[in-house]
Amino acid sequence: MDKPESKPAKVWNDIFDKPDYIFGTEPNDYLVEKKEYFRPGRKVLMVADGEGRNSVWAAALGADVDAFDLSEKAVEKAEKLAAEKGVSVNYFISGVDEWDWEEAKYDVVVVIFVQFATPNMRTRLFANCIKTLKKGGLLILQGYTPKQLEYKTGGPSILGHLYT
């Protein structure tokens, strides 16, 4: 018997169950600024990677990329994008609390706009990101601050989901 879909997984599957790529297929601009960290031989983890635009880009630069997302639909689209671009990415369906945060495994961990985690989940997530980094590794993090609420241009509307 299949495991029942969790409520968050269902929400994200519904969001990603569309033919187009919600955020496009080009990498996040902030991540592109960090291009030098994704050279061949670097082991990279993309957390909550969505439809794969960032993981595919990093793999195209030669990085050895693992990526996970809670949404099966997002991972399916990520795998399709990787195949279209001719790159290899190790994709997994997982939530941040279910992921196997192996100690000192990655040179780079990327967390881009994981804004819907509760403060407690975010504390666990960030601790696990540090745990899974090799000594001297790099955590690349991008998220909204409380100032974003004034702009009303996207992101979460819950203050506790914003980074301080």
What name fits each language-model region?
Residues M1-R39, K147:
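Conserved class I S-adenosyl-L-methionine
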Residues E51-A63:
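Conserved SAM-binding loop of SAM-dependent methyltransferases across substrates and taxa
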Residues S71-K73:
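Conserved SAM/SAH-binding beta-strand->alpha-helix loop
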Residues K85-D97:
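Conserved SAM-binding strand-loop segment of SAM-dependent methyltransferases
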Residues W99-V108:
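A short acidic, Gly/Pro-enriched loop at the edge of an enzyme's catalytic core
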Residues F116-C129:
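A short, conserved alpha-helix within the catalytic core of class I
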Residues G136-Y144:
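Conserved beta-strand signature within the Rossmann-like core of class I S-adenosyl-L-methionine
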Residues L141, Q148-T164:
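Acceptor-substrate binding/catalytic loop of class I
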